Amino acid sequence: MELQLAIDLLNKEEAAKLAQKVEEYVDIVEIGTPIVINEGLPAVQHLNENINNAKVLADLKIMDAADYEVSQAVKYGADIVTILGVAEDASIKAAVEEAHKHGKALLVDMIAVQNLEQRAKELDEMGADYIAVHTGYDLQAEGKSPLDSLRTVKSVIKNSKVAVAGGIKPDTIKDIVAEDPDLVIVGGGIANADDPVEAAKQCRAAIEGK
């Protein structure tokens, strides 16, 4: 099981500094969509140049022009790139092919997918490296949790890894870990904590069953 830190609401310099502080506890650091919108792919490059061992994920939420956008993210140092599960099959296949051509990975974000079970099966067959169930900010505000979606996707896929994101914090991560996902994505639960290092440490301990 891997741990990913998602950073959304900082600038690229602040994001790199936070990543440096917690890197020993996380496997992947994500430059979130808001940072990409504000600062572009150079934010991915800046992070890549300032951390040592963690992989870098560029949360582009690709919807079209998939092979080009994956290639650009990879050029700027991304190890993993995201595409939306509601994108066309042709886009998903092109993104998978482009990522794998460079030895990189593709994460498919299931946000707003209506038929989770069917789409997860299709994405699994298309070669997605990760399928991520994602309760976005707007649904978190309504009290929604990704647990049921996680169970649904885990029950039907054969090859892809399952990732889970959405409001996960150090005090709730054990419920997620109990479902045995391959990747747990924590954003504000670490980034907005009074002590981000301690929060990351607690999340890592939960993942390792300590």
Curated annotation (Swiss-Prot):
Q: Which Pfam families match?
A: OMPdecase
For this protein, the Enzyme Commission number is: 4.1.2.43
Which keywords describe this protein according to UniProt?
Answer: Carbohydrate metabolism, Lyase, One-carbon metabolism
Q: Write down the chemical reaction(s) this protein catalyses.
A: D-ribulose 5-phosphate + formaldehyde = D-arabino-hex-3-ulose 6-phosphate
The answer on whether this UniProt entry bears the keyword Lyase reads yes
Q: Which Gene3D superfamilies match?
A: Aldolase class I
The UniProt entry's GO biological process terms, in alphabetical order, are: 'de novo' pyrimidine nucleobase biosynthetic process; formaldehyde assimilation via ribulose monophosphate cycle; L-ascorbic acid catabolic process; one-carbon metabolic process
Gene Ontology molecular-function annotations: 3-dehydro-L-gulonate-6-phosphate decarboxylase activity; hexulose-6-phosphate synthase activity; orotidine-5'-phosphate decarboxylase activity
Q: Does the keyword Membrane apply?
A: no
Pathway it works in: One-carbon metabolism; formaldehyde assimilation via RuMP pathway; D-fructose 6-phosphate from D-ribulose 5-phosphate and formaldehyde: step 1/2
CDD domains listed in its UniProt record: KGPDC_HPS
The UniProt function text for this chain reads:
Catalyzes the condensation of ribulose 5-phosphate with formaldehyde to form 3-hexulose 6-phosphate.
Q: Can you say what this protein is called?
A: 3-hexulose-6-phosphate synthase
| Originating species | Staphylococcus epidermidis (strain ATCC 35984 / DSM 28319 / BCRC 17069 / CCUG 31568 / BM 3577 / RP62A)
Q: What lineage is this protein's organism placed in?
A: Bacteria, Bacillati, Bacillota, Bacilli, Bacillales
